[in-house]
Amino acid sequence: MLNTYTNSSTKIQGRLSVWLANHKLPHRPLGFDYQGVEILQIRSEDWLSIAVALYVYGFNYLRSQCAYDVAPGGLLASVYHFTKIEDNVDQPEEICIKIFVSRQKPKIPSVFWIWKSADFQERESYDMLGISYENHPRLKRILMPDTWIGWPLRKDYIVPDFYELQDAY
């Protein structure tokens, strides 16, 4: 379970983490990346309400969304990078959100209805890793053929009928 301020002396919390805690929104601070961008972990079931709160807070631009396989047989992660775009600001505020889900039933609420730019990005994560983004209007394969079996970027994926190509010369 994610608790906000349990043992807060061991975690450095950024401005957004403090704001979320003040509004009693569940999250876990994961520190900062090398550029000083705050990273937060959010549970899948809390994601939609937190996403709306982020938009209200001012994060009006979804810069990127990607997903990765944490470990063979382990969790899958969906990562969102948001930016707060404002006039006359040299250094816009940024945030990174990570959502970890089970590979057996990987479901995360879609944020398409908040940030339209999530459309193709969530579809790519679905196509490559099998993460289902609930309430996405067009969640279907975007890179692989509709007949493709499995999720090619999972670490435990085995290519069907794979054979090694030899050098032609």
Curated annotation (Swiss-Prot):
Domain of life from the UniProt record: Eukaryota
Membrane topology value: Peripheral membrane protein
Localization per record: Plastid, Chloroplast thylakoid membrane
UniProt entry keywords in alphabetical sequence: Chloroplast, Membrane, NAD, NADP, Plastid, Plastoquinone, Quinone, Thylakoid, Translocase, Transport
Enzyme class: translocase
Catalytic activity: a plastoquinone + NADH + (n+1) H(+)(in) = a plastoquinol + NAD(+) + n H(+)(out); a plastoquinone + NADPH + (n+1) H(+)(in) = a plastoquinol + NADP(+) + n H(+)(out)
UniProt main location, coarse: plastid
PROSITE patterns membership: COMPLEX1_30K (PS00542)
InterPro entries, per database record: NADH_DH_suC, NADH_quin_OxRdtase_su_C/D-like, NADH_UbQ_OxRdtase_30kDa_su, NADH_UbQ_OxRdtase_CS
EC assignment: 7.1.1.-
Swiss-Prot/TrEMBL GO biological process terms: photosynthesis, light reaction
Tagged with keyword Secreted: no
MF GO annotations: NADH dehydrogenase (ubiquinone) activity; quinone binding
GO CC term (a single one): chloroplast thylakoid membrane
Family affiliation: Belongs to the complex I 30 kDa subunit family.
PANTHER family linked to this entry: NADH DEHYDROGENASE [UBIQUINONE] IRON-SULFUR PROTEIN 3, MITOCHONDRIAL, NADH DEHYDROGENASE UBIQUINONE IRON-SULFUR PROTEIN 3
Subunit structure: NDH is composed of at least 16 different subunits, 5 of which are encoded in the nucleus.
Role this protein plays: NDH shuttles electrons from NAD(P)H:plastoquinone, via FMN and iron-sulfur (Fe-S) centers, to quinones in the photosynthetic chain and possibly in a chloroplast respiratory chain. The immediate electron acceptor for the enzyme in this species is believed to be plastoquinone. Couples the redox reaction to proton translocation, and thus conserves the redox energy in a proton gradient.
Protein name: NAD(P)H-quinone oxidoreductase subunit J, chloroplastic
Source organism (scientific name): Physcomitrium patens (Spreading-leaved earth moss)
